[in-house]
């Protein structure tokens, strides 16, 4: 999770890119410490930012000093539970500041999961390699919105993180005759391993 992180060192950026490309998940929150120029010039070309960042929108001095998420029926697995307001009304959060994004409608690897009433993207997802990146346009504390003050914030965050982890962590519960899947670093491909169990010992190669 990058929560209002200004920049990363080159070595960190390289490691993060490899992690996501190999199936890891990355969650990015905005905020006042985020270096917009660095994100656009470094994180975006590395494939780790769903869209170019624009200016920071600020409604604090407007007659209505906030916007909200658009009420909708979510079909995304991480948000589907919130289609029922009894599980948490996402539209009740007041968003005062957020990063505007410049979306590319032709990029099939990026999709908006939630929007604000202004039309700006609130939550964007990008598929990168075998992994996923989620970008939330506001901060994860209460500096820019009332999101963390709402009862649904903890399950909302947990759902997002669980979804991101699901691409790299196969289910531990298997049905009868279902194949067991385990992920290993790419540089171990082709190495021989021993699979042991109650009734069988078998050598196989990782692919």
Residue ranges, per PLM feature:
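N-linked glycosylation sequons
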Residues: 1-207
């Amino acid at each position: 999770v990058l929560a209002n992180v200004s920049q990363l060192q080159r070595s960190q950026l390289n490691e993060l890119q490899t992690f996501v490309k190999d199936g890891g998940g990355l969650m990015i929150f905005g905020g006042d410490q985020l270096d917009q120029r660095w994100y656009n010039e470094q994180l975006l070309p590395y494939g780790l930012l769903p869209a170019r960042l624009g200016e920071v929108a600020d409604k604090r001095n407007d007659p209505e000093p906030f916007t909200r998420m658009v009420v909708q029926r979510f079909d995304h697995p991480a948000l589907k539970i919130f289609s029922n307001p009894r599980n948490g009304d996402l539209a009740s959060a007041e968003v005062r500041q957020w990063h505007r994004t410049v979306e590319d409608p032709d990029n099939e690897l990026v999709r908006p999961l939630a929007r604000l009433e202004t039309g700006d993207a609130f939550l964007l997802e990008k598929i990168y390699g075998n992994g996923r990146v989620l970008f939330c346009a506001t901060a994860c504390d209460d500096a820019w919105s009332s999101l963390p003050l709402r009862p649904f914030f903890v399950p909302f965050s947990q759902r997002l993180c669980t979804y991101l982890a699901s691409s790299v962590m196969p289910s531990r519960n298997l049905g009868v005759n279902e194949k067991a899947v385990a992920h290993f670093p790419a540089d171990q491909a082709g190495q021989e391993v021993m699979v042991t169990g109650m009734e069988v010992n078998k050598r196989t190669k990782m692919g």
